[in-house]
């Protein structure tokens, strides 16, 4: 029998975790969030420097790559064996190198929290001009002044408490815990040459300074940590990991649920009474 929910969220990434928290806040709403990756238990996720040690076969990333980049060096991608027959009938084997320009890594999170669980934890909002430009194109509600309240609602900023920042939100924002001497020298020199900016997420982004980070008590504060973990005890929220969605079920031009494959290769269906939300990866 299909399991039935009011909302099914496909993808427990940055947006999916927020949706799961907000929707399940209503105890009368049944919410299911599905993630293709594993749970975010790997300590390399939570220790800030850990993301640098995942390597090329990252178990919590989709491990995407770019097309070959002409600016990169050439590398051998294959060495197919071939045989030739000489005029005397002798058979000779040889390998022929096939080379192409190296591809660039494009890691994207495949775990609870999505890319917020494997990124560099830099907290930098978009530029005011971009939001105002979107609004000028007819997207009502997207100007900087209109969305600022949502930035403030989402964060708990340990550094600033002013008209640009919020307190008491789920996403913890803190200063870098270790400002090493070479970086201090760089910031000092850049500030003298141009100008210093203590807060890239304040009145303006231009200038030189230290980043703010999505960390709490020296650990990563992913959207899974900020939004999903506080909601896990809600009886109306179901989290399914290692669930590869195979098909969105459509009935009369309406998404009514999903078909997915679990970690053992078994197929299951889930029905959504109200809404099926698909979170696709954003790659620019």
Roles of regions detected by a PLM:
Residues 1-282:
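N-terminal redox-cofactor-binding region of secreted/periplasmic oxidoreductases
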């Amino acid at each position: 029998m299909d399991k039935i929910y009011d909302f099914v969220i496909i993808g427990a990434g940055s947006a999916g975790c927020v949706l799961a928290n907000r929707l399940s806040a209503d105890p009368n709403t049944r919410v299911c969030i599905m993630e293709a990756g594993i749970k975010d238990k790997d300590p390399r996720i939570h220790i800030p420097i850990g993301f640098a040690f995942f390597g090329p076969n990252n178990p919590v990333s989709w491990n995407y790559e770019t097309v070959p980049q002409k600016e990169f060096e050439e590398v051998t991608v294959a060495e197919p064996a071939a045989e030739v027959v000489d005029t005397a009938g002798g058979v000779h084997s040889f390998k022929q190198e096939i080379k192409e320009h190296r591809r660039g890594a494009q890691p994207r999170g495949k775990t609870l929290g999505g890319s917020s669980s494997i990124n560099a934890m830099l907290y930098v909002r978009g530029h005011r001009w971009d939001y105002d430009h979107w609004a000028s194109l007819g997207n009502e509600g997207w100007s900087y002044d209109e969305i600022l309240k949502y930035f403030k609602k989402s964060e708990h900023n340990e550094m600033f408490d002013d008209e640009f920042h919020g307190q008491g939100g789920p996403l913890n924002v803190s200063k870098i815990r270790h400002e090493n001497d070479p970086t201090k020298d760089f910031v000092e020199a850049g500030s003298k040459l141009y100008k210093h900016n203590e807060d890239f997420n304040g009145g303006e982004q231009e200038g030189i300074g230290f980043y703010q980070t999505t960390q709490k008590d020296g650990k990563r504060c992913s959207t899974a940590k900020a939004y999903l973990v506080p909601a896990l005890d809600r009886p109306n929220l179901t989290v399914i990991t290692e669930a590869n969605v195979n098909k969105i079920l459509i009935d009369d031009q309406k998404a009514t649920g999903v078909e997915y494959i679990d970690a053992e290769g078994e197929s299951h269906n889930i029905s959504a009474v109200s809404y099926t939300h698909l979170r696709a990866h954003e790659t620019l």
